[in-house]
A protein has these predicted regions:
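Conserved, well-structured core segments that form the ligand-binding/active-site neighborhood
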Residues: 1-19
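Conserved functional hotspot residues or short segments at active or partner-binding sites
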Residues: 75-187
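Noncatalytic linker/hinge segments flanking ATPase motor cores
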Residues: 3, 56-61, 169-171
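Glycine-rich, aromatic-lined ligand/substrate-binding cores of catalytic
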Residues: 20-98, 105
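Short gly/pro-enriched beta-turn/loop segments at secondary-structure junctions
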Residues: 8-10, 64-69, 120-122
Length: 188
């Protein structure tokens, strides 16, 4: 912002060092109170899950908005949550297990006025972090999208520009439509 002179006049900034800061500490290991960065990221666990599961914002899958657990719960009316959770658990991703979850997104003022599948029962998964130091959010999101793409090719709709914007390029979308293996989809 400053380097590109987006604001005028340019402010004079002063860097203030934080005493006792440990860069590899989790937020809840500090004495800093949690302030949600978004209405749909109410807690630290959601913030940890969000980077991977936000990919579903570029699809017709509910990312859990309109529920108490956005991004922790994902699904659609046509998903078999038991099969999806089994598929994902078979990948044996570190620090996470997946459990079947059914939920009904509803409007929540100030958070989600018109969630995907509003007032419709959705089935899918809940992401349970078992070890946040080993959990890999992007791998979880990519393999979940990969699994749904392969399980429901005629039901899953991907908004290509939306997914590409979230991913930063078209490489994930291209790999999905080329039908790469699970191992190759994780090469990013």
């Amino acid at each position: 912002i400053i380097e590109n002179k987006w604001i005028s006049p340019l402010p004079e900034l002063e860097i203030i060092k934080i005493e006792g800061w440990q860069p590899n500490a989790w937020y809840d290991q500090t004495d800093i109170p949690w302030v949600p960065p978004s209405p749909n990221i109410p807690d630290l666990k959601t913030a940890i899950i969000y980077p991977g599961m936000c990919l579903f914002e570029g699809t017709n899958i509910s990312e859990g908005r309109g529920t108490p657990n956005p991004f922790k719960w994902i699904g659609a009316p046509w998903i078999d949550g038991k099969k999806l959770s089994q598929t994902l658990n078979n990948f044996k991703l570190p620090g996470v297990v997946f459990v079947p979850k059914s939920f009904t997104p509803i409007p929540i003022p100030g958070k989600s006025e018109n969630p995907k599948f509003k007032n419709q029962k959705c089935h899918g998964i809940e992401v349970w972090i078992t070890d946040r130091d080993k959990y890999r959010s992007i791998d979880v999101g990519v393999l979940t999208l990969y699994s749904i793409y392969n399980m429901y090719p005629n039901k899953l709709k991907i908004r290509e520009t939306g997914l590409n914007r979230l991913w930063g390029s078209n490489s994930l979308y291209e790999k999905l439509i080329r039908g790469v293996t699970a191992q190759d989809i994780l090469k990013y």
